[in-house]
Amino acid sequence: MKIVIADDHAVVRTGFSMILNFQEDMEVVATAADGGEAYQKVMEHKPDVLIMDLSMPPGESGLIATSKISESFPETKILILTMYDDEEYLFHVLRNGAKGYILKNAPDEQLLLAVRTVYKGETYVDMKLTTSLVNEFVNHKHSDDVSTNDPFKILSKRELEILPLIAKGYGNKDIAEKLFVSVKTVEAHKTHIMTKLDLKSKPELVEYALKKKLLDF
């Protein structure tokens, strides 16, 4: 099978490439340092599996790239590689098209099992995350209700400018410089956005921005 690895750390890309290329049934055909490059490599090589870090530089995070790649190249199975052993992140990446979720500290045997599992079209979740959580997600995956009273309509013009920048991974300082405002102003708007939209975490904000088509790729 053909594999692409996307991670912003060169040592991770090199280490995982060595592990996978040692297997007779696996070949790493390309690597990428961010989500945008991952998209280009997938488009170029049409790999069977994309192993992608969830946290990469601003602009093309793993979560955003997952949604984009899974929609454009459904034949490529995405395995998320991350440090987050939090079911909240798991739910978001599965909802956005990933087929697997594995922690960076997982043993080599588990990584190989994960790759082979998603290659077959099956879902793989790191052993540290329980089966009950996955079952709960599957049962409620298609039950999202769309509210008739959309809080999006009450966001201010400035909040509408800041929301997609946060979702793309820009930090408060970067946003402040981009919009010529203070960091404290950005922090205040960020708090207002989370409150108005009833969002509890950044992954929820990213998913919301994707649903509202606020992100340009």
From Swiss-Prot:
The modification 4-aspartylphosphate is found at D53. Residues 148-213 form the HTH luxR-type domain. Residues 2-119 form the Response regulatory domain. It comes from the Bacteria. GO terms for biological process: phosphorelay signal transduction system; regulation of DNA-templated transcription. It is found in: Cytoplasm. The keyword Thylakoid does not apply. Phosphorylated by NreB. Residues 172-191 bind DNA. The keyword Transcription regulation applies. It holds the Pfam family Response_reg. Gene3D superfamilies: 3.40.50.2300. GO terms for cellular component: cytoplasm. Keywords: Activator, Cytoplasm, DNA-binding, Phosphoprotein, Transcription, Transcription regulation, Two-component regulatory system. One of its GO terms (molecular function) is DNA binding. SUPFAM superfamilies: C-terminal effector domain of the bipartite response regulators, CheY-like. Member of the two-component regulatory system NreB/NreC involved in the control of dissimilatory nitrate/nitrite reduction in response to oxygen. Phosphorylated NreC binds to a GC-rich palindromic sequence at the promoters of the nitrate (narGHJI) and nitrite (nir) reductase operons, as well as the putative nitrate transporter gene narT, and activates their expression. This is Oxygen regulatory protein NreC. It comes from Staphylococcus haemolyticus (strain JCSC1435). The lineage of its organism: Bacteria, Bacillati, Bacillota, Bacilli, Bacillales. The gene is nreC.
